[in-house]
Regions:
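Active-site HxH/HxHxD metal-binding segment of metal-dependent hydrolases
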Residues: 33, 55-180
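Short hydrophobic/aromatic-enriched beta-strand-loop microsegments
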Residues: 98-104, 206-208, 304
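C-terminal regulatory/interaction regions
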Residues: 280-321
Length: 321
């Protein structure tokens, strides 16, 4: 067995007692059928965790609607990594809910929030209008209404409300009292900050862009490192063989119910690509990404040329070239 060719597109839905998937309508050669945003709540709970809310706009509204239909408030937002197709909806979701954000690397998310009008006020991250002075007001009524952008009247009037961005804790953690227990597991390679979010109650792992059922991911050099990616595949295999994980929830495409064949297919793909690069170099191809793409990546969608170039750079670094 290897990668699985989907007979019908993945559409998301209520996939387990604790987990919903809202699949975004952003298909592309990079995002496949769309980004998976995940909602996680304990049975009977009134609050949930949202993982990877992106893109903004329609997807955020669908996440809010799904939570509303399930009778859930959003108590926390978590990112598996900080690529745009996994974090772009965070400002809009924070504006709508005031939920804290947890991420393995916070700088890009903080920049995104600031771009959308959030700022640090009074030593604590609060939502302020862009261009305002410290606790400047936003155009809204004093009774607590939101403006058209979803921002509160002012930081002062909404003390405690705002963009609270925190680094993911090490080890087991619950974002709030009735939340499911998670454990962040470092899975660098696709990006330096990539993590898997283990849900022990279901022996499931939210893998972001580390592993897909339908095909390989990209190692985004220089942030992504191939040696780290191989180590992350080993980590995934160990988690499965130890019985800690039985199911993967990826950032794109169907859940992975039989992980070991997909892990092995992914590892084989990476090794085969390395061997193809070495063969091309031995045959006289220049050690330049564009030349190697033309020699090795024949048949690849031209829209994937630039991501493939990033992976080729990662391969050359791995080979010490």
């Amino acid at each position: 067995m290897g990668f699985v060719e989907d007979e019908t597109p993945w559409c998301g839905g209520h996939v387990s007692a604790r987990v919903w998937c809202v699949r975004a309508n952003n298909p592309s050669p990079m995002t496949y059928v769309g980004t998976n945003s995940w909602i996680v709540a304990e049975p009977g709970a009134k609050e949930c965790v949202v993982i990877d809310p992106a893109p903004a706009g329609e997807q955020v509204q669908r996440i809010l609607a799904t939570c509303g239909e399930a009778g859930l408030r959003i108590g926390a937002i978590v990112a598996t990594h900080d690529h745009p197709d996994h974090i772009e909806g965070i400002p809009e979701l924070v504006a709508a809910t005031g939920a804290p954000v947890y991420a393995p690397r916070t700088s890009r998310i903080e920049q995104l929030l600031q771009k959308h009008g959030f700022a640090k006020c009074g030593g604590v991250k609060r939502a302020c209008s862009e261009g305002s002075e410290d606790l400047g007001a936003v155009e809204a009524g004093a009774a607590g209404e939101l403006d058209s952008g979803g921002l509160p009247h002012s930081c002062e009037e909404k003390a405690g409300w705002g963009a609270d961005v925190q680094a993911l804790p090490k080890g087991a953690f619950r974002p709030f009292e009735e939340a499911s227990e998670f454990e962040a597991i470092a899975l660098p390679g696709h990006s330096e900050d990539s993590v898997g979010l283990l849900l022990p109650a279901e022996q499931s792992l939210f893998t972001g862009d580390v592993l897909f059922r339908h095909g390989p991911t990209v190692v985004f050099h220089p942030d992504g490192v191939l040696a780290s990616y191989f180590a992350s595949l080993d980590t995934l295999e160990r988690l499965v063989r130890e019985g800690r994980v039985r199911r993967f929830y990826p950032g794109h495409g169907y859940p992975i119910n039989d992980p070991l064949p997909i892990i092995e297919a992914t590892r084989k793909h990476r090794v085969d690509r390395l061997n193809q690069v070495k063969e091309a170099l031995n045959a006289g191809t220049l050690a330049e990404p564009d030349a190697l793409f033309d020699a090795v990546y024949q048949g690849v969608n031209p829209a994937l040329r630039m991501p493939s170039i990033r992976s080729i750079r990662a391969q050359l670094k791995f080979l010490g070239i």
